[in-house]
Design a protein with these regions (language model features):
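Conserved serine/cysteine hydrolase catalytic core
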Residues: 182-248, 258
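Catalytic histidine-centered segment of alpha/beta-hydrolase-like enzymes
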Residues: 259-272
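Conserved catalytic-core motifs of eukaryotic protein kinase domains, centered on the activation segment
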Residues: 42-44, 68-74, 134-137, 239-240
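Conserved HGGG/HGGXW glycine-rich cap/lid loop of the alpha/beta-hydrolase fold
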Residues: 14-70
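Active-site loop/oxyanion-hole signature of alpha/beta-hydrolase fold enzymes
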Residues: 45, 49, 53, 58-100, ...
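Alpha/beta-hydrolase fold catalytic core
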Residues: 1-32, 53-55, 94-95, 250-253, ...
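Flexible "cap/lid" loop of the alpha/beta hydrolase fold
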Residues: 110-114, 121-154
Length: 282
């Protein structure tokens, strides 16, 4: 396993934290984007280090998540997320790279492949549900109170009961990494306004620079070679979604693995194996 390094890079009004593995200058590097909800780069340490034997692998915390800072302008737009990819890869001095994204990162990596096809060698989609945007939360977009629980166990409890629980709900050590101890209790390291896609303040009047398209349509525009790794027990891929994906994208190989939605936790070896075979000697 490759040793971990940590770094930061500025992007717009945030400071992005990232974990890096492997030596620069090897084969085509890989950027891994974690999902939304209760994931961050911590969940990808094992997979990233295993993939970094012959190349550099970087996995950042999304803006507003984990050790990355919250956006003062509450800008969690698609433009901002694509700019963050550009900022991280510029910071580590990459030209072309392989892009992998899990869960709510799926729409972002697909959009990046459409908008910046010359930057990518290959695309790895990991259990990203196709018929919803996991970042599109309902309700108030800004001014939401932070999530605070009296104990670590209280924070874990509701997520442990989910049909497809994240590691946060099952692993106390992992949960601690995602929480900050405050006078009121344990606060989640995530901006409660992370679903806001319209910046406030000076950036509010700026037009979007890139279209946000329906996900099925946008994936059909991708020219970069791609694969889908999905969990056989994942609630993101019911039979009707698998059927539609197979029909509409016969050119994108699917690799089902014995896992629920949290593929990097439940099927890391299978994910690593399929990824290595797909990227080959690139």
């Amino acid at each position: 396993m490759a040793e971990q390094r940590i770094g930061r890079v500025n992007s717009g009004d945030v400071s992005l934290f990232y974990r890096a593995f492997g030596a620069p200058g090897g084969k085509t590097p890989i950027l891994i984007l974690h999902g939304s909800n209760y994931y961050d780069s911590y969940d990808w340490i094992g997979v990233a280090s295993a993939l970094a034997i012959d190349r550099e692998v970087v996995t950042p915390d999304r803006r507003g998540w984990g050790e990355s800072t919250w956006s003062p302008s509450k800008d969690y737009s698609r433009d901002a997320l694509l700019d963050d990819i550009l900022a991280v890869t510029a910071g580590v001095r990459w030209d072309k790279f392989i892009l992998m994204g899990h869960s709510g990162a799926g729409p972002v990596i697909i959009s990046f492949a459409v908008n910046f096809p010359d930057r990518l060698e290959k695309l790895v989609i990991v259990d990203s549900q196709m018929n919803r945007d996991e970042n599109a939360g309902a309700g108030q977009k800004i001014g939401n109170p932070p999530q605070i629980w009296p104990t670590v166990e209280a924070a874990m409890a509701p997520f442990a009961k989910l049909n497809n629980p994240p590691r946060f709900g099952l692993d106390r050590e992992r949960a601690l990494q995602a929480l900050i101890k405050t006078e009121q209790g344990y606060m989640l390291k995530r901006d409660p306004d992370n679903a806001n896609t319209n910046a406030i303040g000076e950036g509010a009047a700026l037009p979007a620079r890139r279209l946000v398209r329906e996900m099925w349509m946008e994936l059909g525009m991708v020219k970069t070679p791609a694969i889908l790794v999905r969990g056989l027990q994942s609630d993101r891929f019911p039979p009707e979604t698998v059927e539609r994906f197979t029909k509409e994208y016969p050119h994108i190989p699917q690799f089902p693995v014995n896992s629920q939605h949290d593929v990097p936790r439940m099927a890391p070896d299978a994910l690593i194996g399929h990824t290595k075979k797909f990227i080959g000697s690139v």
